Amino acid sequence: MIGVFVNSKHVPYARKIVEGNKLYESRTKNTLKKLVGKRVGIIETGNGYPMIVGEVTIGKARFVTKRMWDGIYRALSCVPYGSEYDASGEGKWCYEMKEPIPYDEPIFLPKNAIRHGRAWCEFDI
């Protein structure tokens, strides 16, 4: 399985994704482009050991200008104004989070997970 890391230290972004409340995941770089169209696990990080909290299908990737971000995508991404994840400079990459399914019980990320940079990994469960 493929998993995407979502920092949830201050805001439960990973849970918001799998519960269907966070419709877009945003990144400063196009780090999830290889995952568009794939079913992935959402890995909650920032609160101890990484946990897989559910699954989504990653939809279209689009570069969103700062103006578009401020107009609509900030709200769809559940990112508060002034947060460390707020858009700066030219804008951000936004990925649709489709068909979310939360797990009844989170699963510990296996220790043998193969990381692909800081954005995602592969593992067997």
Residue ranges and their predicted role:
Residues M1-I125:
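Structured alpha/beta reader/binder surfaces that contact nucleic acids or chromatin modification marks
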